[in-house]
Amino acid sequence: MLDIKRVRDNFAEIKEMLLTRNEDLGNLDDFENLDAKRRELIAKTEELKAERNKVSEQISVMKRNKENADEVIARMRQVGDEIKELDIQLNDVEDRFKDMMMRLPNVPHESVPVGTTEDDNVEEYTWGEIPAFDFEIKAHWDLATDLKIVDFERGAKVTGSRFLFYRGLGARLERALMTFMMDLHAEEHGYEEMLPPVIVNRESLTGTGQLPKFEEDVFKLAETDYFMIPTAEVPVTNFYRDEILTAEALPQGFAAYSACFRSEAGSAGRDTRGLIRQHQFNKVELVRFVKPEESYEQLELLTGHAEKVLQLLGLPYRKLKMCTADLGFTAAKKYDLEVWIPAQNMYREISSCSNFEDFQARRANIRFRREPNAKPEYVHTLNGSGLAIGRTVAAILENYQQADGSVVIPEVLRPYMGGKEVIAPK
């Protein structure tokens, strides 16, 4: 959520910046009227409450002096009725105002390129050599099926489209990647490991920004107010919801492995085959809580941690700085890492690394004190995929495929695969 005072004091500038985001701004133009009405009602209510307190004291004095207080008592009742009526109006305005603020996206950072489509994203650099093949390459879904390490058909039979079974060395590869990533982030990058719940309440999804605007994108448990998480970012960020941290506790980072669940409501017809877009997938997520003045330095650090996974796996990738129209709802600045997928002859997203500044912290009420008695300030939150495991499997299968249909296992994963070097056709 945006800082109300910042929007109030810089409305025209904030509106102009938000319009570059290619997001639905809802009833933003009502901000000034609603804000003024809200402040007017608050002032009137406080004025009447002060009068009620004064009249109450006056009645006490009159009763002690055995004076007739009927008129004053009648006035106090009238004031009480006026306060009740104003409270009803104020609650209505507050609800409308809060709903509007909850649906406004974050303000882009000044370093974010202005753009209208994904074509305006800026490529920072590429890493690694794109492999050259002297044979006809296969898509990862054909490789996985031929090697009998993923079963798409039975996943669809048991559940539905965009579900699958990993089996044999496919299940082992998925598990190896998870353990490798968690070891790297915990032992070398200094993150604390976390295994979060995969079901959260409405407050948690509101805190990280998925609700109320994007409820159709998440799976809701019937007849409850519980949801399946779309990413571990949700439970891990909400770990500190409604808490005040010490300055010494910052910066703080968590690496969390979890299953993720997404309805892909807006993705009909896209990536209908393979591992790129599943309703259920596993991911390692990096979340950081930092002081405001450190957050952009921390964004570079976090992005580097995600890049290190790709580098150690020997997977070619590129780093994109996302333009204003492709930031998503919550980010002030975002980098995407895209891994090379040979069969598609293109880079595909495998990680998004974002600085939300205090946008999530305001929604989730996560604060810190610089000194023991100092006024609490909002932390800045960051997160990034470190990495999405299914897409990493797809990239390994395609980039490491051999002419005989086998797939070489990246060297860094072999200790996690029992020393096995190749996944070969049976």
UniProtKB/Swiss-Prot annotation:
The keyword Nucleotide-binding applies. ATP binds at R262, S263, E264, E349, I350, S351, S352. Pathway: Aminoacyl-tRNA biosynthesis; selenocysteinyl-tRNA(Sec) biosynthesis; L-seryl-tRNA(Sec) from L-serine and tRNA(Sec): step 1/1. L-serine binds at T231, A232, E233, E285, S385. InterPro entries: aa-tRNA-synt_IIb, aa-tRNA-synth_II, aa-tRNA-synth_II/BPL/LPL, Ser-tRNA-ligase_type_1, Ser-tRNA-synth_1_N, SerRS_1_N_sf, SerRS_core, tRNA-bd_arm. It comes from the Bacteria. GO terms for biological process: selenocysteine biosynthetic process; seryl-tRNA aminoacylation. It is found in: Cytoplasm. GO terms for cellular component: cytoplasm. Keywords: Aminoacyl-tRNA synthetase, ATP-binding, Cytoplasm, Ligase, Nucleotide-binding, Protein biosynthesis. It catalyses: tRNA(Ser) + L-serine + ATP = L-seryl-tRNA(Ser) + AMP + diphosphate + H(+); tRNA(Sec) + L-serine + ATP = L-seryl-tRNA(Sec) + AMP + diphosphate + H(+). GO terms for molecular function: ATP binding; catalytic activity, acting on a protein; serine-tRNA ligase activity; transferase activity. Its EC number is 6.1.1.11. Homodimer. The tRNA molecule binds across the dimer. Belongs to the class-II aminoacyl-tRNA synthetase family. Type-1 seryl-tRNA synthetase subfamily. Consists of two distinct domains, a catalytic core and a N-terminal extension that is involved in tRNA binding. Catalyzes the attachment of serine to tRNA(Ser). Is also able to aminoacylate tRNA(Sec) with serine, to form the misacylated tRNA L-seryl-tRNA(Sec), which will be further converted into selenocysteinyl-tRNA(Sec). This is Serine--tRNA ligase. It comes from Lysinibacillus sphaericus (strain C3-41).
